[in-house]
């Protein structure tokens, strides 16, 4: 991460921003080698779907076999925390300002969108990874794939 994100954001807001960022980030193959978001989002979605049933299974298995409840609860809590860790990482990433090279690339893509006649809201502050995700998603939907040749 280039610079530190705003530390005044609460934990719950970070998780919500992470979920929004996960939904916004374009899952395009061309971006996978450049950004870890595709892998983190896929692992987080998998964890959201699989880990709660796994936690319940772990608890019921230990209770049914008369095992110790403490390790079963610890395992269940760890399994449920994995998707939260992914959402937290995505939330922190979404509010992180872009490094200078990515900011330049962001402005180039934004300029191409404006040249093609797309209406974009004016930037009020330094671009973050969330604004990059918004612009990339719009560029993949509206522009041809040649805008990626600059990478």
Curated annotation (Swiss-Prot):
It holds the Pfam family DUF412. The keyword Transmembrane helix applies. Keywords: Cell inner membrane, Cell membrane, Membrane, Transmembrane, Transmembrane helix. GO terms for cellular component: plasma membrane. It is found in: Cell inner membrane. Belongs to the UPF0208 family. This is UPF0208 membrane protein ECA3038. The keyword Transmembrane applies. It is a multi-pass membrane protein. The chain crosses the membrane at residues 46-66, 69-89. Its main location: membrane. It comes from the Bacteria. It comes from Pectobacterium atrosepticum (strain SCRI 1043 / ATCC BAA-672).
């Amino acid at each position: 991460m280039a610079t530190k994100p705003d530390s005044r954001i609460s934990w719950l807001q970070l998780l919500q921003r992470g979920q929004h960022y996960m939904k916004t980030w374009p899952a395009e193959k061309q971006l996978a080698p450049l950004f870890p978001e595709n892998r983190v989002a896929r692992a987080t979605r998998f964890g959201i779907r699989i880990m709660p049933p796994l936690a319940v299974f772990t608890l019921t298995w230990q209770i049914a076999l008369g095992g110790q409840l403490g390790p079963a609860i610890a395992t269940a809590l760890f399994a449920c925390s994995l998707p939260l860790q992914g959402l937290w990482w995505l939330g922190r990433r979404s509010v992180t300002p872009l490094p200078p090279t990515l900011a330049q690339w962001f402005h180039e893509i934004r300029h191409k969108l404006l040249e093609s006649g797309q209406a974009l809201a004016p930037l009020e502050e330094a671009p973050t990874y969330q604004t990059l995700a918004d612009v990339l998603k719009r560029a993949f939907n509206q522009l041809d794939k040649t805008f990626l040749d600059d990478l």
